[in-house]
Regions:
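Residues that recognize and position ribonucleotide moieties
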Residues: 31, 38, 89, 127, ...
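Conserved beta-strand segments of alpha/beta enzyme cores
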Residues: 1-2, 96, 162-164
Length: 197
């Protein structure tokens, strides 16, 4: 089977659905890694699989990483410079995604109180899906939020599906995604520090 990207497959979720449909019901859980996130550690994926295995009603799970001050500063600097950088996520107490944006959400302009945790979560470009959620996804039309933000996971939200946000820990590793040319040196340095240069 040729798994290469076809022009009719607009995003990774659609490509995963096409592969799942072609293979048939062999695999109930499909994991999607995105090529712009080479620093994604294996425990992020393990957390997704654990979350989806623990909840039979969970159709989609994706990792989120609480921003430290350096990551938040990177997001805010990208915005000030007019660059679209990574994606941020907000979710409820049960981990159900409320919204994903290429803007920094929630608003951070009020300043932080001493000892307060940064409430901004970096959405990591990886997903675990149940097969039925993928097949539903490709039957739905692209909505205005997905179109405006350019974020495929918003199609689930726009159609009333739950996207489970699974909080993960960096465990001392630098995590950043390749969104702009200026991200290349940062990612190369992180890979070198992990002995992968």
């Amino acid at each position: 089977m040729n798994l290469s990207r076809r022009e009719t497959r607009l995003n990774g979720t659609e490509r995963c659905a096409a592969v799942s449909r072609a293979l048939g019901p062999v695999y109930d859980v499909i994991v999607n890694l995105q090529g712009d996130a080479p620093l994604t550690p294996p425990w992020f994926l393990e957390a997704l699989i654990e979350a989806i295995d623990a909840d039979p009603d969970c159709g989609v799970a994706t990792p989120v990483l609480r921003c430290d001050q350096q990551a938040l500063d990177g997001f805010l600097e990208d915005r000030r410079a007019g660059r679209v950088g990574g994606t941020t996520a907000v979710f409820d107490a049960a981990g159900r995604g409320l919204y994903f944006s290429k803007e920094v959400i929630p608003y951070t302009g009020r300043g932080m109180k001493p000892g307060e945790s940064i409430p901004v979560f970096h959405h990591v470009g990886a997903y675990a899906y149940r097969r039925n959620a993928l097949l539903d996804y490709v039957d739905w039309r692209t909505g205005p939020l997905e179109t405006w933000e350019g974020l495929e996971q918003l199609r689930f939200l726009e159609n009333g599906a739950v996207v489970r946000c699974v909080e993960v820990q960096a465990r001392g590793r630098v995590f950043w995604e390749l969104n702009n040319p200026g991200d290349v040196p940062r990612i190369e340095a992180a890979l070198a520090s992990q002995g992968m240069d």
